[in-house]
Amino acid sequence: MSRAARVALSVVVAIATALAGYALADARNAGATTALGPGLVTVTVDVHYSKFSLEELHVHAGTTVRFLIHNNDPIRHEFIVGDAQVQALHEKGTHPAHPPVPGEVTVAPGDVGETFYHFDEVGRVLFACHLPGHLAYGMHGWVTVSRR
């Protein structure tokens, strides 16, 4: 292969790699602009200074989301996804920690937690941290579920 061909191939590979990285970053940060699913999708949520990096997520009905929660804070947090009844139970402080229940996870400082939630019905679903004062501080967001 000639030197010019090797240079051209290197440029094409570099551009393709950059575009692939951009596409991956876009999927990770889709948030409010792109409806994900249906099927299984993974969404990463970082916690820093008692704030979720994700404020809003759009999915299609029939989507199961695997939430990966990276707790970068020096304190414990939780990530609870669910309807008003689920949120009300947790706001009353009924659970000090969360066993493996779909849509619920407690994450220790510096740790990564995982939970799955299947979105069937069109509407809005809240996610929040209900540890004392965290919800009022702004640790919450919404998942908007739309028809496919």
Q: Where do the model's predicted regions map?
A:
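Extracellular/periplasmic metallocenter environments
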Residues: 21-22, 26-30, 102-148
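Hydrophobic membrane-insertion alpha-helices, especially the h-region
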Residues: 10-21
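Short aromatic-acidic-glycine turn motif
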Residues: 85-95
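N-terminal Sec-pathway targeting helices
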Residues: 1-10
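Asparagine-centered strand-capping/turn motif at beta-strand->loop junctions
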Residues: 69-71
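Beta-strand signatures of extracellular beta-sandwich domains
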Residues: 78-82
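Extended, low-complexity, turn-rich repeat/linker tracts enriched in Gly/Pro/Ser/Thr and Asp/Glu
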Residues: 73-76
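N-terminal edge beta-strand
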Residues: 35-64
